[in-house]
Amino acid sequence: MTKDELKQRICESVDRRRSQIEGIGDQIMVNPELGFKEFETAKLVANTMEEFGFQTETGLARTGVKAVLKGKNPGPTVALIGELDSLGVADHPMVNPETGAAHACGHNAQI
């Protein structure tokens, strides 16, 4: 498979799951959690990755999630990182009244 064919396959896969991906992003947006307190977000990420067939490891650096998808052949390995913590900004229009947090930094756009 060429690089362009792989890119096309990935784009098609994302397009097929568009509503699910948007729903996850919306769920994270309305449930902001401060850094090292993203327990519900970590559960959501781990559960979603498991639904996609990844093996997950949770509790890394408190709320981190590692997801691994083994291929049929060895290598190459691709690594991605994402941050989904929010900020304590009490005056943000989408602040969570319970936590005082909001996704005001753009991390949630990684979804």
Name each model-derived stretch.
Residues 3-104, 109-111:
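Acidic/His- and Gly-rich active-site-bordering loop/insert found
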